[in-house]
């Protein structure tokens, strides 16, 4: 009996060691699974963009004190969101649109652009006492949004000197994840640029045929589209040219690509996120 006791304890110790050894892989598996879950959660959290929670509001700017009988009229309506980068991007594009009304192209803030616009109006009024101050009304909206892609539309109504501007629209596309503006060349597959050019030029030639003899003399033979305003909706992408943009007297031109054409032209990962 005394001989059996040491043997019993010997086998008991071996059994406990075996159980402990069996436990280690399970513990490692659990730790590995937890690490994977934490990594996945971290990646998902990093890719989740702030909810926009869009609110219409008056833009943040100030006009100088006016002692004249006829004072400048500036009204900038904007969109405010939970995404601070997007808010700054919207203000930057509004500043660019305002500058385009007075044929300027500088790196200005919204307030600086308004100051430049006011200065131009003052110069006009100083030329002749009966000259009226400028009027500028900007309406801003998010026209389309798909995942990280946002389409901004800025509409302009203005009265400058003897020129009245009504419903002039500008389009801008942003990638919120990369925090950058996107041109049409940024999203098109490089090997599809020639194919897209053929589509655009074909639409352009059809448009030219419908224009007056005067406009036909003014417009270029080919349309340059690399830096054109572009947009996306529920069906596809397109490019936009404002009235008087192609030539002095040319009307507006919008070229729409079909869903199939858009799928063919766009980079696959962008198409998947945009449509």
Task: Provide a role label for each language-model segment.
Residues 1-9:
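Bacterial N-terminal signal peptides that target proteins for export
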Residues 10-11, 184:
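Low-complexity, intrinsically disordered short peptide segments enriched in small/polar/basic residues
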Residues 18-21:
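C-terminal motif of bacterial Sec signal peptides marking the signal peptidase cleavage site
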Residues 23-275:
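Compositionally biased intrinsically disordered regions enriched in Thr/Gly
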């Amino acid at each position: 009996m005394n001989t059996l006791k040491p043997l019993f304890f010997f086998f008991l110790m071996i059994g406990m060691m075996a159980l402990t050894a069996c436990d280690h892989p399970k513990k490692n598996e659990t730790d590995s699974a937890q690490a994977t879950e934490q990594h996945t959660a971290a990646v998902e959290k990093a890719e989740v963009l702030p909810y926009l929670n869009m609110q219409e509001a008056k833009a943040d700017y100030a006009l100088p004190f006016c002692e004249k009988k006829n004072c400048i009229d500036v009204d900038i309506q904007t969109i405010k969101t939970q995404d601070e980068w997007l808010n700054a991007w919207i203000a930057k594009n509004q500043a660019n649109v305002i500058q385009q009304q007075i044929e300027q192209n500088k790196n200005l803030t919204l307030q600086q652009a308004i100051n430049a616009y006011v200065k131009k109006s003052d110069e006009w009024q100083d030329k002749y006492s009966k000259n009226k101050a400028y009027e500028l009304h900007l309406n801003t909206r998010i026209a389309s949004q798909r995942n990280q892609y946002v389409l901004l539309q800025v509409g302009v109504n203005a009265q400058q000197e003897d020129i009245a501007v009504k419903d002039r629209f500008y389009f801008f596309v942003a990638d919120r994840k990369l925090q950058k503006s996107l041109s049409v060349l940024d999203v098109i597959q490089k090997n599809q640029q020639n194919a897209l050019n053929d589509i655009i030029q074909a639409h352009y030639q059809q448009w030219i045929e419908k224009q007056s003899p005067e406009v036909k003399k003014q417009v270029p033979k080919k349309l340059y589209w690399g830096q054109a305003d572009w947009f996306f909706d529920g069906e596809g992408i397109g490019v936009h040219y404002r009235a008087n943009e192609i030539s002095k007297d040319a009307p507006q031109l919008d070229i729409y690509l079909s869903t199939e054409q858009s799928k063919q032209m766009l980079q696959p990962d962008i198409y998947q996120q945009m449509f």
